């Protein structure tokens, strides 16, 4: 189907670079098809420090995680914890820790506070933090390094939580 080819990014694992960087382009050229614009090579996903293996039985079931935590939690964990171009380690303990610390506590607390503040009259938070503007600029410089982007987003969330703590609107009403 010519509507989906050429690929902008050809995503492959590091274990099959030779085939997809040498042979696949040759096949495409011989078929007079355009080459992908770039090749994105990701590392391996390990589990508790070990390479995933059916024999060892340490395969991750994404549906099990989605049923327990939701798809967005799994996406967030993978983007935050697994470096884009390097090997990354999956740990159920770390997933649970991130779910509770980042999503339930830090982000959940911020959303709750902002929702409550939004329901009050005459509460205005003037947040002019230079670091947040710098973090936005950094996002553009880290394309495809999702773990770095997420780290910068969390700096913004923490800065906003800190501003709300310092402003202490619950003491002013």
Labelled PLM ranges:
Residues 1, 111-138, 157-172:
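Conserved, charged catalytic cores of large soluble enzymes
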Residues 1-14:
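Active-site cores that bind ATP or allylic diphosphates and position pyrophosphate for catalysis
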Residues 13-16, 65-66, 95-106, 145-152, ...:
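Secondary-structure capping and boundary motifs in well-ordered enzyme cores
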Residues 43-128:
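Catalytic adenosine-cofactor/nucleotide-binding cores of aminoacyl-tRNA synthetases and other
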Residues 135-147, 154:
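Long, non-coiled-coil amphipathic alpha-helical linker/lever segments
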């Amino acid at each position: 189907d010519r509507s989906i080819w050429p690929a902008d990014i050809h995503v492959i694992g590091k274990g099959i670079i030779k085939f997809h960087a040498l042979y696949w382009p040759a096949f495409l050229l011989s078929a007079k098809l355009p080459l992908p614009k770039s090749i994105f090579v990701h590392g391996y996903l390990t589990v508790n420090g070990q390479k995933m293996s059916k024999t060892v039985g340490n395969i991750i079931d994404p549906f099990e995680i989605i049923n327990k935590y939701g798809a967005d939690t799994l996406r967030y964990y993978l983007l935050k914890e697994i470096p884009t171009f390097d090997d990354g380690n999956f740990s159920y303990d770390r997933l649970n820790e991130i779910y509770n610390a980042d999503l339930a506590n830090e982000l959940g607390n911020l959303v709750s506070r902002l929702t409550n503040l939004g329901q009050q009259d005459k509460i205005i938070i003037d947040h002019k933090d230079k670091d947040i503007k710098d973090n936005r600029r950094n996002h553009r410089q880290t394309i495809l390094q999702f773990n770095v982007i997420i780290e910068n987003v969390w700096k913004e969330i923490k800065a906003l939580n800190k501003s709300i703590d310092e402003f202490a609107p619950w003491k002013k009403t």
